[in-house]
């Protein structure tokens, strides 16, 4: 079998380790500015984009596909229209209007976007075996990096679900499912941010990873694990939060599903060493866990009940934005002690995604 892993040398490993920064969504070192908060709402039929103003969530909205993800980069807001639409749109945050929208092939399912440089972004495609670089000015694809070598078995895609950036390195998180089953642990791949050249890969400790983030110079990865017979997740050691050791090229558990109460559906990291995890027990039962990564301790935030509507941490204000889709659903702002609900119009759809634009 042809060897497909391009192993980085010891010197290059050391380089991208020392290049790590807490601001994992930016490719430069500009100081963080106060952010504008956007919220995406969705039900079974439609989706809408709103924004937070002085009075709460806006009355005005922009319509998008119901399964969309929103991400802010350099004053712009990217809308990733996913299953059933497969589009990428750029919203001008100064006007709250769509600047352009481009189509991907059916089923390519854009899953994440990060800054490549001041003129381009990298876009993850969960439903296709590739990462694409896209021009910010018009949405045109400028480069394609194939990832089919990471496909599991007969699968046609390695299921790229999350991207992150540290220094000049692009990190890609692959679930590697096959026929809707997770037979092997997830995979972390490192690329040159500038041109997508593969540097190295590391096999993760657990199956079905969902998200990653940097804290105290370390990369943490959250995993949902395999589903049980009722399509929930078990409180066992087959899932949880792990930390990557780049020097040893391995990943080990920090806290598992026993402590958390289940697998991690969504994940946000305070760069100072606290992780917030949406613990998916079963449909509608998704509590918020606050994890001290150094102490490996877990506490449950009691003010919310179903945080499947997204988690985003604001590095500047030191607060966590929470999308709760439970009985007291809405957009919440958590200061580390208390979660406060932000006022919203009565016709606003349940929160499905949150983004910060600065």
Residues covered by each model-derived region:
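Bacterial Sec-dependent N-terminal signal peptides
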Residues: 1-41
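Short, conserved, GDST-rich strand-edge loop motifs in beta-rich repeat architectures
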Residues: 32, 173-185, 222-238
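Conserved beta-propeller blade signature
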Residues: 36-40, 76-80, 120-123, 170-172, ...
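Short glycine/acidic-enriched loop and turn motifs that connect beta-strands
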Residues: 43-46, 84-86, 127-130, 177-181, ...
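A short beta-strand motif characteristic of beta-propeller blades
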Residues: 55-63, 97-104, 140-154, 197-203, ...
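Repeated scaffold domains used in trafficking and secretory/extracellular systems
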Residues: 64-75, 108-116, 155-164, 204-215, ...
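Asp-box/WD-like beta-propeller blade repeats and closely related beta-sheet repeat scaffolds
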Residues: 107-114, 124-132, 136-164
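Beta-propeller blade signature
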Residues: 185-193, 236-246, 288-292
């Amino acid at each position: 079998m042809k060897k497909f892993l391009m192993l980085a040398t010891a010197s290059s490993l050391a380089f991208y380790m020392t290049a790590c920064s807490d601001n994992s969504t930016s490719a430069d070192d500009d100081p963080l500015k106060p952010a504008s908060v956007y919220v995406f709402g969705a039900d079974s039929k439609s989706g809408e984009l709103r924004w937070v103003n002085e009075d709460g969530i806006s009355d005005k909205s922009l319509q998008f596909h119901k399964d969309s993800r929103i991400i802010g980069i350099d004053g712009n807001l990217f809308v990733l229209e996913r299953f059933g639409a497969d589009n990428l749109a750029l919203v001008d945050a100064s006007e709250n209007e769509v600047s352009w929208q481009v189509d991907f092939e059916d089923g390519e399912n854009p899953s994440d976007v990060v800054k490549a440089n001041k003129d381009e972004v990298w876009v993850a495609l969960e439903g296709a075996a590739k990462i694409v670089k896209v021009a910010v000015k018009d949405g045109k694809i400028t480069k394609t990096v194939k990832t089919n070598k990471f496909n599991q078995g007969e699968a046609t895609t390695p299921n790229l679900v999350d991207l992150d950036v540290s220094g000049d390195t692009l990190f890609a998180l692959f679930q590697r499912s096959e026929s809707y089953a997770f037979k092997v642990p997830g995979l972390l791949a490192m690329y040159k941010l500038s041109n997508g050249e593969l540097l190295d890969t590391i096999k993760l400790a657990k199956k079905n990873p969902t998200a990653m983030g940097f804290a105290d110079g370390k990369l943490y990865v959250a995993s949902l694990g395999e589903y049980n017979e009722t399509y929930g997740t078990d409180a066992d050691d087959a899932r949880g939060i792990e930390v990557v050791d780049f020097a040893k090229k391995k990943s080990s558990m920090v806290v598992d599903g026993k402590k958390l109460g289940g697998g991690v559906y969504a994940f946000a990291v305070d760069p100072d060493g606290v992780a917030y995890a949406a613990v998916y027990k079963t449909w509608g039962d998704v509590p918020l866990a606050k994890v001290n990564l150094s102490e490996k301790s877990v506490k449950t935030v009691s003010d919310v009940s179903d945080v499947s509507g997204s988690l985003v941490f604001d590095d500047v204000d030191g607060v966590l934005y929470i999308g709760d889709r439970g009985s007291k659903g809405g957009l919440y702002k958590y200061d580390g002690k208390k979660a406060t609900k932000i006022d919203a119009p009565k016709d606003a759809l349940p929160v499905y995604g949150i983004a910060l634009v600065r």
